[in-house]
Amino acid sequence: MAHTIYSNFYLSNEVEDQYKSHLDLQQFCKVDNTLTGSAGMKRKINVYSATDGTETLAMGAGNSKSIEVKYSQKEYEILLAQNRFKYFDEQEMTDPMLVPVGVRHMGTDLFNYVNKGIYTEFKKANLAVAAEKLNFGAFADAVANMNIEYTDNEAETVSQLAFAFVNPADVAELRKNLAEDLKYVESFVRTGYVGTVAGVNIYTKKDADKGTIIVAIRAAVTLFNKKGVEVEQDRDGDKRENTIWSRKYYLPALTDATKVVKVIVGKAKKSTDTTVNASKTYYKQHGTGYIVGTPTANPSTENFYEIG
């Protein structure tokens, strides 16, 4: 078995950083503990979204469509996250820290795995803002594109709601871009602390996508959760081999697409494609930003945009 153990009698145990991200994403989404059933079972969920409604009009003409908030029913599959840890009696006797470290990492690994699923749902956002530069304006536009009631007049209320997941490299860029605005703020001068930008709380997430920032409120994603973690153990007495399993049933889902926006570093340009490229994402103008759309035939003549 491929464990690396200490052969010394006197042990010093140093555990490397096991977390993909130190952020517990369950605090950033709604948690519904009513999940029942087993892995593979289906659950239907209402997903709210917004349609685009911006048109170019001639004089005297009116809009032929309106921006609408609607929901569609999507079918999700209940997920089972499980891991396994095996060790021999002789390994535990040689290195007493083997089992505690192994069992601790089982919990860490489940944490990382569920976190990854939650973040994946946030990344399904179909609202976007193009930002040539990460600055105050980019986050202000993101908040303006979300379907929340508080904007200009109650910024302190927005700051209790909105958050952003930012890659460390993008946080560094944001610090540089805000340096002039924050040069008289003591905490920024001493530590580079940014905190809140345009009512959005900034959270560094080391495995977030570089160049794409997720801005959202908790209502965007729901974690349907079956409470508790199941633990099962088994032992082969003849071989002195021990096995521990830990498992969790859960289901993360984007339940309100109007409450999450992607800030994409880059410029929005009108598409020059004359045919649809399946590998590309096309956008329509939506408020101060854009919304993912699907061209019928010709992205260029249908006024679709690309961001990058």
List each model region and its residues:
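Long, contiguous amphipathic alpha-helices that act as assembly "spine/axial" helices in icosahedral shell
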Residues: 45, 68-127, 164, 236-248, ...
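Cell-envelope/extracellular anchoring and linker segments
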Residues: 116, 120, 132-148, 159, ...
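Extended, solvent-exposed, turn-rich assembly/linker loops in the middle of proteins
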Residues: 124-195
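Short, intrinsically disordered N-terminal pre-domain segments
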Residues: 1-23, 270-274, 278-280, 286-288, ...
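Glycine/small-residue-rich hydrophobic helix-like segments
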Residues: 191-236
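Extended, compositionally biased alpha-helical segments that mediate assembly or anchoring
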Residues: 233-272
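Short helix/loop capping segments that flank catalytic or ligand/cofactor-binding pockets
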Residues: 53-56, 173-176, 253-255
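N-terminal "assembly arms/tails" that initiate or stabilize quaternary assembly
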Residues: 1-71, 238
